[in-house]
Amino acid sequence: MAAILGDTIMVAKGLVKLTQAAVETHLQHLGIGGELIMAARALQSTAVEQIGMFLGKVQGQDKHEEYFAENFGGPEGEFHFSVPHAAGASTDFSSASAPDQSAPPSLGHAHSEGPAPAYVASGPFREAGFPGQASSPLGRANGRLFANPRDSFSAMGFQRRFFHQDQSPVGGLTAEDIEKARQAKARPENKQHKQTLSEHARERKVPVTRIGRLANFGGLAVGLGFGALAEVAKKSLRSEDPSGKKAVLGSSPFLSEANAERIVRTLCKVRGAALKLGQMLSIQDDAFINPHLAKIFERVRQSADFMPLKQMMKTLNNDLGPNWRDKLEYFEERPFAAASIGQVHLARMKGGREVAMKIQYPGVAQSINSDVNNLMAVLNMSNMLPEGLFPEHLIDVLRRELALECDYQREAACARKFRDLLKGHPFFYVPEIVDELCSPHVLTTELVSGFPLDQAEGLSQEIRNEICYNILVLCLRELFEFHFMQTDPNWSNFFYDPQQHKVALLDFGATREYDRSFTDLYIQIIRAAADRDRETVRAKSIEMKFLTGYEVKVMEDAHLDAILILGEAFASDEPFDFGTQSTTEKIHNLIPVMLRHRLVPPPEETYSLHRKMGGSFLICSKLKARFPCKAMFEEAYSNYCKRQAQQ
């Protein structure tokens, strides 16, 4: 009973103080002050006293206030606002004159619309404070909410509680200043970021056996068939809408909402190579595949189911041994990310170092061939993909690449090499590998902070330009200087940290080397494209075996146009506007012609290379970057020629 009355006292007094603060704020905003403000304060003081007397009498006490004797461990119970004082986030509504020590202190309140921010620990494992703090509506407050511990509401037998209030004055703080502070707080670069699992992700066991995985694809095929029949029936009964647009998702009855849900649900359940292929398609623009199918694969990219605890622990015990947890102080059993091949868990080493543990789904490495075959059969059956988009030789390349991505020991070695190559880089960094917690199916690295680039569209134009500029420079260095490239341009493989103003590079499973015999010719093709030299592009393309020289005119023109479009960005000293140039869309419009008339498959190296280059250009396009590119290529070309001369 005592605890309930104590909480009631605090709430009642707090409401009175909030009312006073609101009244004073509106009076000051309207330019009214003086006697009205003093009267409001007197009224508030009287109300607080009467509430204290009334509730004290209910308890059978004559004293207005006593101490709470509760001890929450001293200063650990302090509240903090997430906005600095200087930004005007904490407002003191006490009078300008010397405070009356007998009157209750005023309540500091964040000047913002709606409730104050909820508690957020400064790190994933930092204590949030005493019990109940995380649900407090007060948010964080720097300084004491009450200037004197004796001013806290209390009654005999209650526990002592400490609150804190910022006593800094707000003299001269205008509504404009407060609005600027509010806008500064809202900017993406000023927020703390922590990666979390998609709200669509569910805990579902990964089907391990090939028969179990085949059953899921078989169920998907049957479901798509029935869904398509239902959609055809709907179309026959439904006319076009008044605007003249089609009443269904697209021309294919297989692309209904119900079928989209079936595809997403199946791929997120089986994961592995099938989900990886869907994620690869998700980073293409709408000119490459049906825009409705692109939306399906975008949902696939953003959400994957995660393993049940028992299945995940079995993988860890098999790979790291039964005592792997002895090396950790903490292990978060629910993952904070789930992808196509594995899921990522937060952990803390004995020394306090926070790490990310990527755990591979069981059975995905052994089922690559069957998964790819099953998914392609389903997609081809439903006519969802452009004809000839995945010829047999490309499928073979994808199988080999996916097998390499399942080798976490190889990925760890690639990450170490990239970390050495970019050591001391002012903008990029590669998280360190934690060798003692790595195995063929477990990869552990230091934890990085930030957010993926698909969430960077709200950043300033200057920051977006800098991010994209550095990504393109890195692409050129990877190919022409390192001869070693991370070829997966997935948004989530680039994490921007606004506090450090750096980009962390993640996921090196798709890394591959490029021989100098390949890059010697390829850089000459880009050189000719930047110079708009169509004949040299043709000659070098034949030398590289892109063309045989016997292609029909329409095929040759499509190939040359695609190369020249790629070189447009490097052709001019003027800023190149990626947001309006539609480089990837122009190239993708030529793909159907090349698929139909190509006589020989392109060099195997170009599949991953063009995926990386096209994905990097697409990042620049999505972020609407605008900067000159000619100088970066000229520098890369000059340095390459110097290294050639020295060999």
Swiss-Prot record:
Residues 1-162 form a transit peptide. InterPro entries: ABC1_dom (IPR004147), ADCK3_dom (IPR034646), Atypical_kinase_ADCK (IPR051409), Kinase-like_dom_sf (IPR011009). Changing residue 299 to W: In COQ10D4; decreased stability. Its main location: mitochondrion. GO terms for biological process: phosphorylation; ubiquinone biosynthetic process. The active site is at residue 488. A motif (AAAS motif) lies at residues 337-340. ATP binds at residues 340, 358, 445-448, 493, 507. Pathway: Cofactor biosynthesis; ubiquinone biosynthesis. Widely expressed, with highest levels in adrenal gland, heart, pancreas, nasal mucosa, stomach, uterus and skeletal muscle. Induction: By p53/TP53. Changing residue 429 to C: In COQ10D4; decreased stability. A motif (KxGQ motif) lies at residues 276-279. The chain crosses the membrane at residues 214-230. Belongs to the protein kinase superfamily. ADCK protein kinase family. It is linked to Coenzyme Q10 deficiency, primary, 4: An autosomal recessive disorder characterized by childhood-onset of cerebellar ataxia and exercise intolerance. Patient manifest gait ataxia and cerebellar atrophy with slow progression. Additional features include brisk tendon reflexes and Hoffmann sign, variable psychomotor retardation and variable seizures. Atypical kinase involved in the biosynthesis of coenzyme Q, also named ubiquinone, an essential lipid-soluble electron transporter for aerobic cellular respiration. Its substrate specificity is still unclear: may act as a protein kinase that mediates phosphorylation of COQ3. According to other reports, acts as a small molecule kinase, possibly a lipid kinase that phosphorylates a prenyl lipid in the ubiquinone biosynthesis pathway, as suggested by its ability to bind coenzyme Q lipid intermediates. However, the small molecule kinase activity was not confirmed by another publication. This is Atypical kinase COQ8A, mitochondrial. It comes from Homo sapiens (Human). The lineage of its organism: Eukaryota, Metazoa, Chordata, Craniata, Vertebrata. The gene is COQ8A.
